[in-house]
Structures are given as structure tokens and as C-alpha cells.
UniProtKB/Swiss-Prot annotation:
This is Hydroxyethylthiazole kinase. Pathway: Cofactor biosynthesis; thiamine diphosphate biosynthesis; 4-methyl-5-(2-phosphoethyl)-thiazole from 5-(2-hydroxyethyl)-4-methylthiazole: step 1/1. Substrate binds at residues 37, 185. Signal peptide: none annotated. GO terms for molecular function: ATP binding; hydroxyethylthiazole kinase activity; magnesium ion binding. It comes from Rhizobium etli (strain ATCC 51251 / DSM 11541 / JCM 21823 / NBRC 15573 / CFN 42). The keyword Repeat does not apply. The gene is thiM.
Amino acid sequence: MLDAMREKPPLVHCITNYVAMNIAANVLLASGASPAMVHAPEEAGEFAGIASALTVNIGTLSTQWIDGMQAAAKAAASAGKPWVLDPVAHYATTFRRQAVADLLALKPTIIRGNASEIIALAGGESRGQGVDSRDPVEQAEDSARRLAERQQAIVAVTGAVDFVTDGERAVRIKGGSVLMPEVTALGCSLTCLIGAFAATAPEDLFGATVAALATFAVAGEDAALGAAGPGSFAWRFLDALAALDGEALDARARVSLA
């Protein structure tokens, strides 16, 4: 799937936060996709109809941004394009909770979050603090299954060991590095990469989500080998993504049934 994406680079419409825009665009470029950071409500809906996939991250919200997100999500859904929701710290404020509730009503095809975000989104009590998860992934697995069934969507919980489910099937993905949480917006970038894989294989959104997470996990392992800390890890991670190919990914991905 990685090789197929590079052979025909998808245009991924990323509505993401200010912190993440640069690294998310570079992650997509290194992986072989084409990023577009378009969030103005005056054009977001039109652009979503052009793009191969849409990703929506609520990290830096405003009323205008929400208008753009909703316009894009409606257009993507109407055009049958996959779209990914990243409900960053949605539990933190009333404004965020309402924004996410409205976006969920527009039926995202994939939802990606940390454990605290997914637990809260499914109706449970999480221990999240701001954008940081205080809950381990394994405690969010049942919540992810319930959320996937309720939303009829793929749900990915990312952390030390990732978890992906469609409500029936479920897998865990091992790999990555302890340095990954020390580089801001890598998780936001992963949401964009999920969109790229979903655009490449819209007929297999479960497999596309797993492939994106496995790509991040293997690249994270490679980047950590020579990294002295988060600074050198960040650029090594981009290099690792660019160097990874489908054969190496298939050989090294650690995916198991859950």
C-alpha cells in the first residue's frame, strides 16, 4: 500500500492546527503524498471535493475554523471521500465538546485519538490533561470498539502500542520510540498520514489505517537508532519515512490480532 501511494500520490486536504501544519506537510511529503493545508470556510468545502481525502484536527479551534471543518466534512461525505477526525482534547471545554459532537454527526470514516480522547468520546471518564493522555491504550480498547460500532467508523487509539478496530475486527501495532511523544504534533501528522493511506485504498479503510500506523511505528524505530534526543529524532524520522518502502514495511510491521 505504501508503494501504491507513492506511485500515485494522493492529494490530502489537511485541516490541522497551527502547531502541526509544517511537520504534517513534511510527513506526507516524505511518505509520498501531497499535502494541502486549507481551512478557510470560503474554500474548504470546494477543496474537499477536489482532494482524495480529508483530515480534520481540532487542535486550534475558532468559530471560523469550525465553519471550514464542517463545510469540508459535508463535501467529503457527499463526494464519498474518506475523512478522518482527530478530536484533540475534545473533553477540555464546552466549545470543543460541541464542535466534536457536530463533526461526529457528519460521519467521519476514521477517528484517531489518544486513549483519553477515545475513552471520553465513547462516553467514559478519562484522565486526560489538556492534549496529553493519562490513560493507557489498553484501557481504551473497549471504548474504541463501542465508538466504532456507534459511529460505524474505524477507530484508532495511538500510544505505546496502537489499537485499531471497526467494532468487529481489531489489531494491535507495536513499534515506534519513546521519543515520539517528545516531538510536538507527530500524532497530528499521523492523522494526516491515515488520510493519505485511506485515499490510496478507500475500499479497505481498516487496512489503510493499520498500514499508516505501522509505517509510523517502523519509521519511529529507525529514527531512534541514531537519535541523541527529540531534536535529532525529528529530522531522522522524516528521513526514515522517506527511506521506507513497501517490502521493508511488510517485513517489519508488528501487527497482531486483538
